A protein has these predicted regions:
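Short, glycine-/small- and polar/acidic-enriched structural segments
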Residues: 22-174, 181, 188-194, 208-211, ...
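Conserved C-terminal helix/tail region of periplasmic/extracytoplasmic solute-binding proteins
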Residues: 303-334
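Secondary-structure end/capping motifs
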Residues: 232-309
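Bacterial N-terminal signal peptides
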Residues: 6-14
Length: 334
């Protein structure tokens, strides 16, 4: 697969509709390379950041770049943030790993979830030939990305749903939620999001199950903000949310915009693959309030003395989406 350029400089030639003549610089971490980041790329391509008065600079982490390469997606080095100490105030990623990182790592960023696009577990399970369905995973090795990650949460929550012990009846393998792990025989199946799901058939692997059917609440992909930054720059964060929500709505009603983004950034031009990925986009929340039920599930799945020192309310702020909802923006995002 050709490398793709991950850039998100807003179009300076497009003046924001609010009449503001100077764009506000915002640094954003996209976390990983996945379909959940397409709204941000579309927002840049279509001038939506600039429309809302923002000059957005987006990067992904070095670890995410390595993970993407393991499934055939190569990110140019210029767009990889290798300075882990330079944390962006706004992050697009999973709420579950954010909460785990803060609770279990003294250096974890004090962030709150302000928007959730994936309020239910939506990963699929991709398996090697010979495994017909999810029930056949008992006794097998299942790959996930890392402890506390969305794929780890999904694996543990699925095991609980099926009445399996994750310590005795399945083997969870960290750092293996990619096609290379399947190709090399390190695992029998992996938890995968839309990007890997789309690439799996051509690699000879089968999609054996969609976790959406289990209706498991989750603090999945969304927007998280440093608490201090939010307190000082609430209007900037609100404008970022407006650009994100408007971009998502644009993708959902205009397949050409979505298809163009897939072709440009991910080199995915196959119509069948695009159709499958668009089905995932159509599941994005119309009113993306922070997933409170999902956050509570994080506390339940990762119960520990340290986790019990915190409360779910520490990790979300619904007021921004509520403000946009009350104004009518969520019903007519433009």
């Amino acid at each position: 697969m050709r490398g793709f350029v991950l850039t998100a400089l807003a179009l300076a030639a497009v003046w924001p509709s609010s009449g503001i003549e100077q764009l506000t610089r915002v640094d954003v971490s996209l976390g990983d390379v996945s379909i959940n980041k397409v709204p941000q790329l579309v927002a840049a391509d279509q001038g939506l950041y600039a429309k809302h008065g923002l000059d957005v600079h987006q990067t992904i982490s070095a670890g995410a770049a390595r993970a993407a390469a393991a499934s055939g997606v190569v990110v140019p080095d210029a767009y990889v943030n290798r300075d882990a100490s330079a944390a962006a105030p706004i992050e697009v990623g999973g709420g579950s790993p954010m909460i785990n990182g803060f609770v279990n790592n003294a250096r974890g960023a004090a962030r709150v979830i302000v928007l959730t696009q994936e309020a239910m577990a939506m990963d699929h399970i991709i398996a090697r030939p010979g495994i017909a369905g999810i029930q056949d995973l008992k006794g097998k090795r299942i790959g996930f990305s890392g402890v506390g990650s969305v794929t780890h949460f999904s694996a543990l929550r699925l095991a609980r749903q099926l009445g399996w012990s994750p310590d005795r009846e399945i083997t969870l393998v960290a750092g293996s939620a990619n096609l290379d792990a399947l190709k090399q025989g390190k695992v029998d199946a992996i938890l995968a999001s839309a990007m890997v799901i789309a690439l799996a058939p051509q690699a000879g692997f089968k999609d054996i199950g969609d976790l959406t059917a289990y209706k498991m609440p989750m603090a999945g992909s969304g927007i998280m903000v440093d608490k201090a930054y939010l307190a000082a720059h609430r209007d900037t964060v609100l404008r970022f949310l407006k650009a994100d929500i408007e971009s998502t709505a644009l993708m959902q009603r205009d397949r050409r915009v979505f298809n163009a983004a897939l072709g440009k950034w991910f080199n995915i031009a196959d119509a069948r693959t695009q159709d499958g990925m668009f089905a995932h986009v159509k599941k994005f929340e119309k009113k993306p309030y922070p997933s409170v039920d999902g956050i509570k599930q994080v506390f339940a799945i990762y119960d520990s003395p340290e986790m019990r020192r915190h409360r779910p309310e520490e990790f979300y702020d619904s007021s921004l989406v509520a403000e946009l909802d009350k104004s009518g923006f969520l019903d007519n995002p433009k």
